[in-house]
Design a protein with these regions (language model features):
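Hydrophobic residues in alpha-helical segments
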Residues: 3, 49-50, 131
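Residues at the starts of beta-strands that form the adenosine-phosphate
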Residues: 8, 34, 143
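S-adenosyl-L-methionine
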Residues: 12-107
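Conserved SAM-binding loop of SAM-dependent methyltransferases across substrates and taxa
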Residues: 1-9, 125
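Generic beta-strand/beta-sheet core signal
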Residues: 12, 38-40, 114-117, 147
Length: 223
C-alpha cells in the first residue's frame, strides 16, 4: 500500500525465503524501484539505516540553478528561480546487489512498521539512542507502529507499559488500536507512538523519564 502512494520502503525479513518472495512480489507489482529488500537481523537492519551517513540523506533539497553566462538580466533572473534537476541520490543509484548487503547509512523515514506481533515489541529497544542528530536535524522523528498481542484480561495501558519496558523510556501520546481477535482470549493490537528526541538521540532527559517513578502523568491513550 505504501508504494502505491509513491512512498519508498526499506523492508527486511530474517527468513531468506520471505526476503526472496518480498523482492519477487515487488517486481510483480511493478514497484521494485520503490522497495529495497534486505535479509538481516532486525536490530542490525535498523542500526545500519540509522548510522551516520557519508553524505546527503536520501531526500535532497531543491538547489537553485546558476544563471548561465550571457543573455539578458531578465532571462538570467528567470533561470535563477527555476529549480535545478535534483542530483542523483543513493536510493536511485542502489543496485540489486546492494539490496543484498547493508542498507544505506544516513537514511531518513517517516514511519516504521513492525508487523511480527509475536515478538516485535521486544525489539523496541533498538531505537533508543540510535538516531544521529546531524542526519535528522530538525526533521520530525518517525512514528513507530508495533503489532503485538494482548490477553483478554490485559488493558491497553498494560500493553503500553510493556512497550515502554522494552523501549526503556516513556512514550509520548501512545495510541493502541485493536486489529482483530486471533483466538479466544487473544487479541492483536497495533501500538503506535512518535519517538521523543530525548529517546531517539539518547539525551539525559530520556534517561530521567525512563527511570521516573509512577507519579508522572501519562497522556491519555486512544481507545
Amino acid at each position: 500500500p505504501a508504494t502505491k502512494a509513491g512512498l519508498r520502503v526499506y523492508a527486511n525479513d530474517l527468513n531468506p525465503h520471505c526476503a526472496r518472495y518480498l523482492r519477487e512480489n515487488a517486481a510483480a507489482n511493478r514497484v521494485k524501484n520503490l522497495v529495497k529488500c534486505y535479509n538481516l537481523d532486525a536490530r542490525a537492519f535498523v542500526r545500519a539505516l540509522l548510522a551516520p551517513g557519508p553524505g546527503p540523506t536520501v531526500e535532497e533539497p531543491d538547489v537553485p540553478a546558476e544563471p548561465e553566462s550571457g543573455g539578458s538580466e531578465k532571462s538570467a533572473g528567470k533561470r535563477e528561480r527555476k529549480p535545478a534537476p535534483k542530483p542523483p541520490v543513493r536510493w536511485a543509484a542502489m543496485t540489486p546487489e546492494e539490496d543484498e548487503g547493508a542498507p544505506p547509512a544516513g537514511a531518513v523515514f517517516d514511519h516504521v512498521t513492525m508487523n511480527l506481533p509475536a515478538s516485535a515489541i521486544e525489539f523496541l529497544d533498538v531505537f533508543k539512542g540510535a538516531f544521529d542528530r546531524a542526519t535528522w536535524g530538525d526533521r520530525k522523528l518517525p512514528t513507530i507502529h508495533c503489532y503485538t498481542f494482548k490477553r483478554a484480561d490485559e488493558t491497553k495501558d498494560d500493553v503500553i507499559k510493556r512497550g515502554e519496558g522494552h523501549l526503556g523510556a516513556r512514550m509520548a501520546s501512545p495510541r493502541v488500536r485493536e486489529v482483530r481477535d486471533v483466538a479466544p482470549n487473544k487479541i492483536m493490537l497495533c501500538l503506535s507512538f512518535t519517538l521523543d528526541p530525548e529517546v531517539a538521540f539518547g539525551e539525559d532527559d530520556g534517561e530521567k523519564r525512563a527511570t521516573d517513578g509512577g507519579e508522572s502523568k501519562r497522556p491519555r491513550t486512544e481507545r
